Amino acid sequence: NYFNEFDKRFESGELYEKDKAKIDDSLKFKTKKGRIVYGGGGIMPDVFVPYEDAHGSEGLTMLMQSGLVNYFVFEQLDKNRKKFDGISTDDLEIEIKKGNYFNDFKIYMAKGGLLFNLETQKEKVLFYLHAEFVRQLFNEAAYYQLLLKKDDMVQKVLSK
């Protein structure tokens, strides 16, 4: 099953280090254009990008995927919609960083019973808050454009 396979790769370290991936050399062959590929399932990418969630940031990942950021931003916009009328994405980023959104989000989490120490992840939290504001004020395309600018895998592949 896919999730068990992911867990095995996570535990073996092959998501973090290219050399940890086990490739069966007996299933090696060349394509018509001379490229070496391996059989046996799965794809080894041309550009290896280590899995970005280092041990210890699982809580932040879970939090960002929980929908809590979405609800928080919705409530912020519901209370202050006029403040954001006509704002650009760049000005929105400045507003998120200069405003009290990080502390307000921590309070919002605590009220919901979630107690995470986010101080070491403040920049990431602010980034995800900014992205969610962009999604709710603009559209999904603007949201994903913003996320992809900070996506390590996308950036590494584009730099090749």
Regions found by a protein language model. Give the residues of each.
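Conserved functional hotspot residues or short segments at active or partner-binding sites
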Residues: Y2-K160
